[in-house]
Amino acid sequence: MATTATCTRFTDDYQLFEELGKGAFSVVRRCVKKTSTQEYAAKIINTKKLSARDHQKLEREARICRLLKHPNIVRLHDSISEEGFHYLVFDLVTGGELFEDIVAREYYSEADASHCIHQILESVNHIHQHDIVHRDLKPENLLLASKCKGAAVKLADFGLAIEVQGEQQAWFGFAGTPGYLSPEVLRKDPYGKPVDIWACGVILYILLVGYPPFWDEDQHKLYQQIKAGAYDFPSPEWDTVTPEAKNLINQMLTINPAKRITADQALKHPWVCQRSTVASMMHRQETVECLRKFNARRKLKGAILTTMLVSRNFSAAKSLLNKKSDGGVKKRKSSSSVHLMPQSNNKNSLVSPAQEPAPLQTAMEPQTTVVHNATDGIKGSTESCNTTTEDEDLKVRKQEIIKITEQLIEAINNGDFEAYTKICDPGLTSFEPEALGNLVEGMDFHKFYFENLLSKNSKPIHTTILNPHVHVIGEDAACIAYIRLTQYIDGQGRPRTSQSEETRVWHRRDGKWLNVHYHCSGAPAAPLQ
């Protein structure tokens, strides 16, 4: 929208300091208001790279956050648009994640878990009173106001939150984090406020024993468990939990959303409002130990996803945050060829990166937030829930990564080490079958294969790239994951095919993309003859 003068209110009123977190199109930095010296966290969104739909989502997030003023919610203090950037000024919360704080405590009891869920329910009740559904309640979004003992729990990240009409149920799209999704969302039924209560039930279960009620490495099996409400209270860890706590979990994890307890009702449950007499005060050391392992798994898997972005079921997976690639068959004049196959339509497994980081944290959930709908809560659209409109600039950058990856593979097929080195960083790191599981750094290891095998190969090689998934990481980094089929003629003149699952991390320096890390599983990419 055209304006006569450029707004500089954020620049005038606030001073920026160190970075606290970063996303694809946003960065979070500590800032201080010049007139009061009060500290805040500024989420800075690069609006030049946002599509019209992303602008709608940004406006919705700001609109929702402006409504919510509660001691257990990270508060939005200001929303400012300047030329090319939008600033969301939030509370600066310094206590870290609730779950990380619990494992550092010397004493933790059922009563403490009750106090935690009480605060979470207070925040959920407040947003539900304002006809808001969070849709992404999980440990990463439960923060502590400070590092002081007894600091308030704060609910963060309203990037997936939606506005609803009272108790009315509707289909707002498939969004959330797998382990915390409700049965009605998985069934693609109309849903509403009860989805947040289901997630609270999962969180409460973890708070009491340190592990989740539903878990399976196979996401399809995980979803089957959730839809069936297949959880229990196994011995011995649940033997010391009071019946009242189990009763509240059962009411929260009720499959039928119409019969599920509400936030207001849960706040009146004896285990919550009469914790001093109902909840056990016994120290739960086993829970702390299990929760420590649970946190470690979350961080480890989050780190792996952040750097590798590869699915265990890669050939069946479909990242529905990415539209189908536009590339067709790429024919080369050389003896090698690279053929790009667009993404599969297989819907058995879904792997998606988090669409937006929490405004005040950087940790990622191992079961990352997934969004598979076109409207993402913008009501009135009849578009398919399996498509997403992407920013045009983002599409162009993804195509750039696919193209440069094809060029690199063509250089390998042609045995052209000079062309290969121009596309790779001199300090390229790699995990590949030829290195027997060792991390290789630099070009010498690869040079051996170029000089002794690839450059001497006169037989044709044809490569097909299947299901390329490109993830843009900030302005100058990207990751591509794909399956590579290599067809070649062996020493006896027989046609052969080898398959490998590959990931390449790219970094742009001085306007040029360089491959900085490579990960390969399966058969060697360069077939031995």
From Swiss-Prot:
GO aspect biological process, one term: regulation of neuron projection development
Transmembrane segments: none
Residue list for modification Phosphothreonine: 287, 306-307
Primary location recorded for the protein, binned into one broad class: membrane
EC numbers: 2.7.11.17
Catalytic reactions of this protein: L-seryl-[protein] + ATP = O-phospho-L-seryl-[protein] + ADP + H(+); L-threonyl-[protein] + ATP = O-phospho-L-threonyl-[protein] + ADP + H(+)
Topological type in the membrane: Peripheral membrane protein
Ways its activity is controlled: Activated by Ca(2+)/calmodulin. Binding of calmodulin results in conformational change that relieves intrasteric autoinhibition and allows autophosphorylation of Thr-287 which turns the kinase in a constitutively active form and confers to the kinase a Ca(2+)-independent activity.
Enzyme class: transferase
Occurrences of domain Protein kinase (ranges): 14-272
Residue span of region Autoinhibitory domain: 283-292
GTP-binding found in the keyword field: no
PTM-bearing positions, type Phosphoserine: 311, 334, 349, 352, 455
Signal peptide: none
Region called Disordered, residue ranges: 324-353
One function term, GO molecular function aspect: protein serine kinase activity
InterPro entries, alphabetized: Ca/CaM-dep_prot_kinase-assoc, Kinase-like_dom_sf, NTF2-like_dom_sf, Prot_kinase_dom, Protein_kinase_ATP_BS, Ser/Thr_kinase_AS
Region (Calmodulin-binding): 294-316
Cell compartment(s), UniProt: Sarcoplasmic reticulum membrane
The keyword tRNA processing appears for this protein: no
GO CC terms: postsynaptic density; sarcoplasmic reticulum membrane
Pfam families associated with the record: CaMKII_AD, Pkinase
Known outcome of mutating residue 43 to M: Abolished calmodulin-dependent protein kinase activity. Abolished ability to phosphorylate STAT1
Subunit structure: CAMK2 is composed of 4 different chains: alpha (CAMK2A), beta (CAMK2B), gamma (CAMK2G), and delta (CAMK2D). The different isoforms assemble into homo- or heteromultimeric holoenzymes composed of 12 subunits with two hexameric rings stacked one on top of the other.
Record remark on domains: The CAMK2 protein kinases contain a unique C-terminal subunit association domain responsible for oligomerization.
The protein's name: Calcium/calmodulin-dependent protein kinase type II subunit gamma
Upper taxonomic lineage: Eukaryota, Metazoa, Chordata, Craniata, Vertebrata
